[in-house]
Amino acid sequence: MRLLADSHLSRRCVQACLRLQPQFPIVHIADWLDGRHCISKDPVLLSVLREHGLIIVGFDRRTMAMHAGELTKAGAGHAGVILFRRSVSQMDYGKQSRLLVEFWNEAKDWDWADRIEYLPRS
């Protein structure tokens, strides 16, 4: 497992990813560690994910990227962030899953430390 879907991303997206690619390395935050980080604040969650080597995937463009950048500037860093752009509807699980699976097949071997990517890519 390498990717963690945050609470803003539906479990339906996770299921759609797994239908496209049965071994896709994603888990929903509610299913990871018994859901104990579902309500964690972004800086706390990013720090925990860094310890576990998990890249967060979500829609929280406004605060997640800001907090990730702050952790990087402070020297603490993060394990990586993938955010969907505004053009991707939160209800379009098919588009989300296709974008994520296609992107991950290309990006899985990248150095993800302190990296933030947006889907679709420009």
PLM ranges: what are they?
Residues 42, 48-69:
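Acidic, metal-binding active-site segment of PIN/NYN-like and related structure-specific nucleases
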Residues 1-30, 36-39, 43, 66-122:
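Acidic, PIN/NYN-like endoribonuclease modules and their adjacent C-terminal/linker elements
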